[in-house]
Amino acid sequence: MPLARNMPKNSSPLEKINTGNVKKLSLAWSFSTGVTEGHQAPPIVNNGYMYVTTPNAQVIALNAVTGEELWRYKKEIPADLLMLHNTNRGVALYGDKVYVGTVDSHLIALDAKTGKVVWDATVGDVKALSYITLAPLAAKGKILVGSSGGETGVRGYVAAFDANTGKEAWRTYTTAAPGEPGGDTWPAGDAYKNGGGSIWITGTYDPASNIAYWGTGNPAPWPTEGRPGDNLYTTSTIALDVDTGKIKGHHQYHYNDAWDWDEVSAPVLIDTNINGRKVKGAVHAGRNGYLWMLDRQPSGKLDFVNGISYVYNDVITSLDKTTGRPSYDMSKKPGMGKAVSFCPSLWGGKDWPPEAWNPKTKL
């Protein structure tokens, strides 16, 4: 299955297993990783190998037919660092290598056949509580990763590394500094330096435009009194040029977030027609409870098409018909010394699991 063609839709054209024969499936083999904590990484299969990651920084390669363990890599990480967020959401495959990010903020390239370390790059400063939980994204000779730590006062970023050497190619921050586009959406001072906007779910790559689309997390800290303004580029989808890391476009789903509504899920990329007009869509089911349709321009700009509430929402009262900017019921916005009830909760209408689109049924 060609990954580049199907990944942006999270769909598969395979039809051998269908509704008529799925009941005939039976267990072929099972395998225990030896880790009892919650696993969040899907198995990735290529050339007869199945790659699985576990919460404590392990990568396990199995024979996909028999379930036999072929090799296992484990990075030794101090227990206090594992307490940050002992989660790993998978690997990326590119060429003859397997790539994994770790909670001590390293990006590691392994030989896909042997599990031997090819290179090990330091991505962020774990002493500043920057860590990695997502699966890397492989695109055009680069491996892209992002920083978790929205609740620990990090400045979110996406960083790209050369797939062969591990040398850093570029780094793009998700909280705009003074003098940068969007810098005026933060207060004067250093609030942006600890402003959150973490990247903890893998982005989506469009090879036709060479743009990677990433969802960004909530601004930090949760109370908004110290960070008035829209706080770009938090709670947004950003469009990054894979060659340079430049932000080519963005759409912020809600501004000055006070509800912990990360919008980290990368959009599903679909080509469709709306009212007789062709739209290269980017669809995002938001944690804020709205389903968003954006139009991807060749320049990378993201234009608002529409937004529809798919769960009950008593915070957002309306959307601007042109920009999609929401209006709030301010009585539902929490603050220092102000307790409120609001819906959806901080877990959102949908948390981080991805959406999918079926090109045949258009669902």
Question: Would you name each region that the model predicts?
Answer:
Residues 110, 114-115, 156-167, 230-246, ...:
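Beta-propeller blade signature
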Residues 56, 104, 154-157, 232-234, ...:
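A detector of repeated loop/turn-to-beta-strand junctions in beta-rich toroidal repeat architectures
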Residues 47-49, 95-96, 140-142, 208-210, ...:
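Short coil/turn segments that connect the beta-strands within blades of beta-propeller domains
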Residues 9-126:
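N-terminal cofactor/phosphate-binding cores enriched in small/glycine residues
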Residues 59-60, 107, 158, 203, ...:
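Structural signal for beta-propeller blades
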Residues 1-27, 174-181, 326-330:
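Blade/loop signatures of beta-propeller domains
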